[in-house]
Design a protein with these regions (language model features):
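Eukaryotic intrinsically disordered, low-complexity regulatory linkers and tails enriched in Ser/Thr/Pro
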Residues: 1-79, 85-139
Length: 139
């Protein structure tokens, strides 16, 4: 797949989209009433993360994606945190992810880097959950 095309893997389907991954993520943020830049800024304020930031695409359904490299890198893969079942090291620079639907992908990312990205996205989810609980208890 080239820099202008993406392979999208969903729970029940897989297809090719004639758009780069970042454009798809930007569209998804806009679809749910925000912007990619706004979501990125929100992550920065909550976590202090400025590079390879996880993004909340939609907060009520807890749709959080994280990148495997810089978002501008044409080899960047965006992963939905909630869809991961497990992951394991293939070699020092490659890791496999098994999704909850049984699909498996092999990525050019070290096990440590992927773990760090998952932890960042999980921390973002935790902070959002805490804010929602805090707000619900005040009402």
């Amino acid at each position: 797949i080239d820099s202008e095309t993406s392979r999208v893997i969903e729970t029940e389907a897989e297809y090719i989209v004639n758009n780069p991954p970042l454009n798809i993520l930007e569209y998804s943020c806009e679809y749910f009433g925000s912007s990619y830049e706004g979501r990125k800024e929100g992550t920065k304020k909550l976590l202090g993360i400025t590079h390879k930031s996880p993004i909340v695409v939609e907060e009520s359904r807890k749709i959080i994606f994280f990148p495997t490299t810089s978002a501008e890198n044409e080899k960047c893969v965006w992963i939905n945190l909630e869809k991961i079942d497990k992951y394991y090291k293939l070699d020092p620079k490659r890791t496999a992810i098994v999704f909850k639907n049984g699909d498996l992908i092999e990525l050019d990312i070290s096990y440590g880097s992927l773990t760090n990205q998952i932890l960042r996205a999980s921390r973002l989810k935790f902070l959002l959950d805490q804010r929602i609980l805090k707000k619900e208890n005040k009402i």
